[in-house]
Design a protein with these regions (language model features):
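Non-heme Fe(II)/2-oxoglutarate
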Residues: 1-72, 80
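Conserved metal-binding segment of the jelly-roll/cupin
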Residues: 118-135, 140
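A short beta-strand-loop-beta hairpin characteristic of the jelly-roll/cupin
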Residues: 100, 106-123
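Extracellular structured ligand-interaction cores
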Residues: 67-69, 78-80, 100-104, 111, ...
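Conserved short histidine dyad/triad with adjacent acidic residue
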Residues: 71-96
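A short hydrophobic beta-strand segment most commonly corresponding to one strand
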Residues: 101-106, 126-128, 141-160
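Short, solvent-exposed loop/turn segments at secondary-structure junctions
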Residues: 80, 88, 108-112, 127, ...
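A short secondary-structure junction signal
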Residues: 82-86, 113-118, 138-139, 157-161
Length: 168
């Protein structure tokens, strides 16, 4: 199974997410790890557009996905995100279970290729992303990713549910 599954059916307002993410960037929380410092803004009452996107996802795909967290993630152009998996981190950043897979929506920046070990490079705008496979990226420009993090469901099961068309 490929490590990403591109999404073509949007449930988000890209312009609204971009504007909110840019405004919230100054409030990003910093999570230093051994390899890189993660910069993120989690979904709160100060992120109504992110909350709308999450609710739209839940309406479009009314399944039990378990715990999902949402955030904006910031990566500077040229910053090296070396080989890593998201479900094994050197730093506990929350009380939530580790991330099993994500939906990543690029709302700012170029569509730089993400490289997956043993799979090669993939370019995406929006995709279900298997974060349990070693991957890396060095973006050419600053990137902002809107991210839904699935804490209790594996990539294969999320893809299966997302591919099941409901409400179309």
């Amino acid at each position: 199974m490929e490590p990403i599954t591109k999404l073509t059916d949007t449930f988000w307002n890209e312009k609204g997410l971009r504007e909110e993410a840019l405004f919230q960037k100054q409030n990003a929380l910093l999570f230093p790890t051994k390899k890189v410092t993660i910069r993120a803004v989690p979904m709160t009452e100060r992120t109504p557009e992110l909350t709308r996107m999450y609710k739209a996802f839940c309406e479009k795909y009314p399944y039990d996905f378990g715990i999902i967290s949402c955030s904006y993630m910031y990566i500077d152009g040229g910053e090296d995100y070396p080989w890593h998996v998201d479900n094994v981190v050197g730093l506990k950043v929350s009380e939530l279970p580790p991330v099993q897979c994500t939906i990543n929506i690029l709302v700012e920046g170029s569509e730089t290729a993400v490289e997956f070990e043993n799979f090669g490079e993939y370019v995406y705008k929006a995709a279900v992303f298997n974060t349990s496979i070693m991957h890396r990226i060095t973006p050419k420009s600053d990137r902002i990713i809107t991210r839904l993090s699935f804490r209790e469901m594996c990539y294969k099961d999320v893809v299966r549910k997302v591919k099941t068309k409901i409400n179309n």
